[in-house]
Each structure stands twice: as structure tokens, then as C-alpha cells.
Amino acid sequence: LARAARALPRAFADGSDLAARTDMSLASLFGGLALANAGLGAVHGFAGPLGGMFDAPHGAVCAALLAPVTAANLSALATRAPESPALARYREAARIVTGDPAATAPDLVPWLLDLVRRLGIPRLGHYGIGPADFAAIAGKASQASSMKGNPIGLTPEELMRVLAEAQ
């Protein structure tokens, strides 16, 4: 995570930065191994149905959803499962990516939003995904097997809010 947080903006800014590209290759490999072993979550739960319904690149959809899903998970965990170890994992992720040892779990969300903005990743609306589609997307996402790996079950209202925030 630390490697990707450092290298992605550098590789994006200068595609000839071989060290940054090497770090991103390793981060991608490690991320894939982690996902294969730990399971997926709501980001991929949404990405599957969205990819089937719209001509939208999987990676861009995942990036557009990451901060809103993180925010929804943090809110749901704080409200319904405040003792969940997932909150400590989010806090550790925030500390790693921000470089701030005092960072809290909610600090992760603005960091993710800023990264997506700096990388120029389009929001879901860019792909023609709008509020009229949200109920169908949320319904399909709620049934996706990837949702089983989310740290907490999200309500239909929370799923709709994620889509609105990513739109």
C-alpha cells in the first residue's frame, strides 16, 4: 500500500520513471495476491454489474467507487459494528497512504478523493450512469458474490448513496 501510494502519482506524472513503474508493477502483483486471498468487497460488487450494464472500464469504475464505498463502510462500521477490526485496518491504511502516524480511518476518504482527482479518473456519470440507473445497479450489486467480502453489509440506501457520491 505504501509503495503504491508513493509510486502511482509519480508513474502517472512521468511514464518514463522506471522506478515508479516498477513499484507499481509490484504493488499490482501484491494487490492481486491480496485480493485473491482476502476476498473482494463492495467496490467489486458494484463493478461487475456496472461493467455488464455500461461500457465503462473496470479499473476506472473501481477507482471512482473506492472513496464512496470507503466512506459508506466507515459510517456503517462506526454505527453498527464499532468494535470491528476493519476499523483498525482502515485506520492503518490511512496512516500508510497519508504518511501521518496520527491519521484516522476517515482521513482515508479525502486522500482517495484527491488521488482520483489528480489522476483525472472520470466519475460514473462520464459513462452515462445516472440516478435513473441506481436502483437496478444497487439491486444487482447487492446480489454480487463480491459483496460477501465487504467488512459490513450495506443497506440498499447506503448502496444508493455510494452511487450518488460516485456519479
What positions do the PLM features span?
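Gly/Pro-rich interdomain helix-loop hinge
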Residues: 53-56, 60-133
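Charged/polar positions within long, soluble alpha-helices
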Residues: 9, 33-36, 40, 71, ...
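Intrinsically disordered or highly flexible coil/loop and linker segments, enriched in small
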Residues: 17, 34-40, 102, 121, ...
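Short, amphipathic C-terminal "tail helix"
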Residues: 130-167
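Predominant activation on well-ordered alpha-helical scaffold segments within soluble catalytic domains
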Residues: 1-9, 25-29, 43, 47, ...
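Glycine-rich phosphate/pyrophosphate-binding beta-alpha loops
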Residues: 29-62, 144-149
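Short, solvent-exposed positions on alpha-helices
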Residues: 18-22, 41, 60, 132
